[in-house]
Swiss-Prot record:
Domain RRM, residue spans: 37-115
Protein name listed in UniProt: Nuclear cap-binding protein subunit 2
Similarity-based family: Belongs to the RRM NCBP2 family.
SMART domains, per the entry: RRM (SM00360)
Annotated binding of mRNA, by residue: 17, 40, 109-113, 120-124, 130-131
Function comment: Component of the cap-binding complex (CBC), which binds co-transcriptionally to the 5' cap of pre-mRNAs and is involved in various processes such as pre-mRNA splicing and RNA-mediated gene silencing (RNAi). The CBC complex is involved in miRNA-mediated RNA interference and is required for primary microRNAs (miRNAs) processing. In the CBC complex, ncbp-2 recognizes and binds capped RNAs (m7GpppG-capped RNA) but requires ncbp-1 to stabilize the movement of its N-terminal loop and lock the CBC into a high affinity cap-binding state with the cap structure.
PROSITE patterns per the UniProt record, alphabetical: RRM
Cellular compartments annotated: Nucleus
Cellular component GO terms held in the UniProt record: nuclear cap binding complex; nucleus
């Protein structure tokens, strides 16, 4: 398939993940996704360490850096990270072979990211973590138990 930048006016299926706060047009974001060497990795355990991510994703190629997602208030891990590779080819290999595998007994999700920008390592949820975790109703010990809103409500009752 040949890449044609003229086809970037509408979002395509290159990535299910979209940064809702991306500073630029849909076309700019789509171009960034198609040329990026960065992956967004989600559904990590809060206990997953940076060196574990390096070890797993390093199997696909040379990792430039790993940026662990942090709770905006506590500055503790909150279940996601960004993995930057030196080449698009290594990132593609990781996406094909590592996404939907297990790390710390969790199935991790990886998807293209338009590129890390300082500040994106912090969770955007109301309580500082990921928004996705605020809607979780089940108990998940690897991601802090119940979501914080449910935990606070049950403490009041």
């Amino acid at each position: 398939m040949v890449f044609d930048p003229r086809t970037l006016d509408q979002p395509k299926d290159i990535s299910a993940y979209r940064d809702q706060r991306y500073q630029g047009s849909v076309r700019d974001q789509e171009l960034a996704l198609r040329t990026s060497c960065t992956l967004y990795v989600g559904n990590l355990s809060y206990y997953t360490k940076e060196d574990q991510v390096y070890e797993l994703f390093g199997r696909a190629g040379d990792v430039r850096r790993v940026i662990m997602g942090l709770d905006r208030f506590k500055k503790t891990p909150c279940g996601f990270c960004f993995v930057e590779y030196y080449t698009r080819e290594d990132a593609e290999l990781a996406l094909q072979n590592i996404s939907n595998t297990r790390m710390d007994d969790r199935v991790i999700r990886a998807d293209w990211d338009a590129g890390f920008v300082e500040g994106r390592q912090y969770g955007r949820g109301k309580h500082g973590g990921q928004v996705r975790d605020e809607y979780r109703k089940d108990y998940d010990p690897e991601r802090g138990g119940y979501n914080r809103a449910i935990a606070q409500k049950s403490m009041v009752e």
